[in-house]
């Protein structure tokens, strides 16, 4: 055996590491070339994931465990996490996704000693076996066709050959980027986002009635009935909330693609709720 001093949550411990003749034995608890228990490394990773700086983590580890780490030693450990993230973000993907959902989650983050707003684009895909998969996360500051095209091109480079339906908020420049990357894909604007945008400047006393008229549109049995419901919505509200009517009319094609599908799958297509559920889970840990 070979003696080795290992840092653990109980302090420094002397461990006798078994050896074999070929030198192939690699302990699981304390891997080769490591002088820290996996438990402590996981603690450091968790603190780093919560946004603590390497200096703050170093202070925390000393105060709680009585073990002194330099900031550079902490960085060596956290860099492993960055490598894992990079591998995940660049992993190969399926060749076909019947549906992908795109939505953003926004954070206030510390950058250069000041707090700035950042957005993270989340892309989730529905696989052929019915399971959902997070395809990737991308940080951005401004919405543009160039950024969306870069994301979609990255998906193609990772193996995605075709997408049937893309469901998203009405993000600026996204429709054009989808047509460039996946010409045959159908773009479906999230109905929930569209309703929220329609209600932005609606007075409280009008909300219930206006929502009922909107419901007649997206719960229509088909496109023709939905068009008739839109005409009714326009006759009722155009004079008071013309911006809402105009938004539905100008985006009509990309708002109603879901009506071409059976009722059983429409709700899967016309909302990005699957991403909002994922985003709410992210907020619990960030």
Predicted regions and their residues:
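Acidic/histidine-rich catalytic cores and adjacent linkers
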Residues: 219-286
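DNA-recognition alpha helix
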Residues: 55-66
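Short acidic-hydrophobic surface loop/beta-edge motif
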Residues: 2-8
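Alpha-helix N-cap/N′ positions at the starts of helices
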Residues: 35-40, 209
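Short, amphipathic alpha-helical "recognition" segments used to contact nucleic acids or chromatin
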Residues: 39-51
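RNase H-like nuclease fold core
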Residues: 1, 12, 16-21, 28-34, ...
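A polyampholytic, Gly/Pro-enriched intrinsically disordered region
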Residues: 96, 205-222
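Conserved beta-strand -> loop -> alpha-helix junction used to position metal-binding or nucleic-acid-contacting
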Residues: 165-171, 177-213
